[in-house]
Amino acid sequence: MQLLKSCHYHVCMKVFIQENSWLAKLAAAKLKADQAAIVFGSTIHLHNTSRAAFLANKEWLCHELKHVEQYQQHGFAVFLVKYLLEWVKKGYYNNRFEIEARQNESNISLLKRVSIM
């Protein structure tokens, strides 16, 4: 993941947003949800929500930014494997990475560590 030199005195991650993503559409179908966001690396893929609506929903945004941070901490391939194994063992809701993301939904400090492209 590419890092910027600084972002409001913090190390800053570049985060991309992809609207109308087929990946997010698949996630929505699997979760039986009308809307979905799914993260791959530093890109947040959206289904049935606009970039503006997603960015306005700070809890949802912080949840997905935590996943971006998890990718950064573990590395792309390692995180993806760990996440999928956790999902197979415990399902979506009890997946430790989802629990951590839910616990960070009000962590607005995540917003200071990213630059949304």
Regions found by a protein language model. Give the residues of each.
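Metalloprotease/metallohydrolase-associated module, dominated by Zn2+-dependent proteases
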Residues: 3-48, 74-117
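Active-site recognition of the HExxH zinc-binding catalytic motif
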Residues: 59-71, 101
